[in-house]
Amino acid sequence: EIIIVESNSTDGSRAVVQAYADHPRVTLLLQDRPRGKGFAVREGFAQASGEILLIQDADLEYSLDDYERLIRPIAEGQHRFVLGSRHAAGSGFALRQFADQPVHAFVLNCAHWTFATLINVSCGVWLRDPFTMYKVFHRDCIAGLRFESNRFDFDWELLIKLIRRGHRPIEIPVRYRSRSFKEGKKIAVFRDPLTWLWALAKFRFQRL
């Protein structure tokens, strides 16, 4: 099944996804306004019926051709939680390269390693790419969990809660093409890092 949550984007996404509205294996959820990535993913979770859940953004920074290799370890019962890593062994460090905004790219690359170190130290793991969009897991991993984050801090909440439940992810290399802010990247360079720090402090110690 494919569950599409479209938040009334201004980039033409709605017109594209509406073409699949009548497909028998597609569930289309149309929102009246953008409420953030976390809100959209939580809406999708509520509609999902499959045993394996995979999160995919519509901008296609990540290749759809990696689906099989991400799902296979879970489908074969080897692991419960998989991260599609841009920086795992075999893929190198996929530096964000915004030709038109090199300063923004440099800031995001530095921030990635800084925040990755914080989450690794705080949670007792060693992950090269904890903030990857590709998070794939068996639905049992989130059974009984309540999620509340609406923006990109949802990635922190999901990762931290699954690790605290004992589901330590494996990382599998994936292909990645960075999208610049002029191409529609939505991260708020100053606001979002503050929400990430709050999410780390909150969800690392909050009762599950």
Q: What positions do the PLM features span?
A:
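A conserved acidic beta->alpha catalytic loop
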Residues: 6-15, 60
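Conserved short acidic donor-positioning loop in nucleotide-sugar-dependent glycosyltransferases
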Residues: 7-8, 21, 35
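Acceptor/aglycone-binding surface of glycosyltransferases and processive sugar-polymer synthases
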Residues: 25, 31-47, 52, 64-152, ...
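Short beta-strand/loop segment that forms part of the nucleotide-sugar
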Residues: 1-9, 29-31
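Residue-level signature of catalytic and energy-coupling elements of molecular machines
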Residues: 44, 59, 118, 138, ...
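Catalytic donor-sugar/metal-binding loop of nucleotide-sugar-dependent glycosyltransferases
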Residues: 125-126, 147-150, 159-177
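Catalytic core of nucleotide-sugar-dependent glycosyltransferases
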Residues: 106-118, 189-208
